[in-house]
């Protein structure tokens, strides 16, 4: 067999295998999501799991799009935001799972240094000053924190 044909078939096989794996992961994740969804959103944390000033990453499937997000405990009040800096739409945690400024008082974009307030997601310092993170609806149900999907066109917020 000619080496060109062999390599073409090999690359085609690898490509198709990659598609199959991605499809399987998406369907598996979608099944997991369905089991965790209830009226009002997806349970993303237990109340006692997240201490004040702590942040937890999670994701949602909203209108067929995967939305990467995070939950922050602001002195017992929970807030959830899409994990996208308003400056360049990069994840805030460029350094894995690092969302807080050094003093722990602000959410921080580690790509551009933008600082955001916990309570309203407003950028108070940096290139996006005056803009707010995309907020997600949050409610507490018993001992769980539920986060719902935002309204509107979500294509720009998805990965």
What label would you give each PLM region?
Residues 85, 109-112:
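Short cysteine clusters
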């Amino acid at each position: 067999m000619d080496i060109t044909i062999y390599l073409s078939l090999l690359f085609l096989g690898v490509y198709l295998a990659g598609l199959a794996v991605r499809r399987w992961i998406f369907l598996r994740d979608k099944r997991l999501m369905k089991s965790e969804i209830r009226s009002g959103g997806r349970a993303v944390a237990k109340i006692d799991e997240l201490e004040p000033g702590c942040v937890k990453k999670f994701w949602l499937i909203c209108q067929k799009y995967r939305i990467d997000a995070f939950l922050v405990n602001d002195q017992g009040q929970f807030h959830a935001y899409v994990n996208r800096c308003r400056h360049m739409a990069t994840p805030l945690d460029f350094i894995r799972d690092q969302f807080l400024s050094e003093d722990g008082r602000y959410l921080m974009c580690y790509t551009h240094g933008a600082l955001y307030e916990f309570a309203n997601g407003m950028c108070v310092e940096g290139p996006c000053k005056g803009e707010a993170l995309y907020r997600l609806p949050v409610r507490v149900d018993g001992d769980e924190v539920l986060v719902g999907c935002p309204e509107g066109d979500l294509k720009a917020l998805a990965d």
